[in-house]
Amino acid sequence: EISLGLVGSEMCIRDSYSTFSLWDTYRAAHPLYTLLVPERAGDMVESMIAHKEAKGFLPIWTLWGKENYCMIGNHAVPVIVDAYLKGLITSDPERAYAAIKESLTLSQLNSDWEVYDKYGYYPFDIIEKESVSRTLESAYDDYCAALMAQALGKEEDYRFFMKRAGYYQNLFDKQTGMMRGKDSTGSWRVPFNMFSLSHASSHGGCLLYTSPSPRDR
């Protein structure tokens, strides 16, 4: 359990959760939790925020209470935003949003935001592994952050994150109709095989990542 301090004259205690396999669970499991067990979903979100305040960043893929960076994206963000938009974060949404904004703007081992913002994507000659997947999934996290910023009336932040949410378009190759790796000069990766399970993607190929590409609309 974690203590959230005094609420009125009573100490507020909530269940604490860890070992968030967020790359695997943010799409379906966590949205389902908000419908079936909303009180637990709220506690999970609180645990993610507490993790950020203790470690500096929202959890990515934790094990035994520690971040191991084995997966990509910052998918605590869509989980928190989904919970907020469903009314499960009522006590301090500004605290939740601050955790999101800092995690998406302060670089850490798994996310080099300076490179991301300089090029508008992750170039494969700088970010050697999973550059396509990292770009697409980061753009989706940015879109979710934009939704919360808009809901909180933070228009400047909304515009910032919506611009980033469009970065996925920079890796769309019109000639092949596929998402495709691009280097820091803007050149497409060659050779290119849409069916290849290459280093450009995480647990899939460019064909897999093109059809359900996270959108900014």
Name each model-derived stretch.
Residues E1-I13, P212-D216:
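Short, small-residue-biased leader/transition segments that mark boundaries at the very start
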Residues D15-T19, H30-L35, K66-C70, S131-T135:
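Short, charged/polar micro-motifs that form catalytic or ligand-binding hotspots
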Residues S18, D24-A41, V81-G87, Y143-L152, ...:
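Alpha-helical support elements that line or immediately flank enzyme active sites
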Residues S18-T19, P38-G42, S47, H51, ...:
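A conserved hydrophobic secondary-structure block that centers on an alpha-helix together
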Residues P31-T34, G42-V45, P59-I60, T176:
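Short, solvent-exposed loop/turn and secondary-structure capping segments
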Residues S47-E155, F160-Y168, S202-G204:
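Active-site cavity-forming subdomains of large catalytic enzyme subunits
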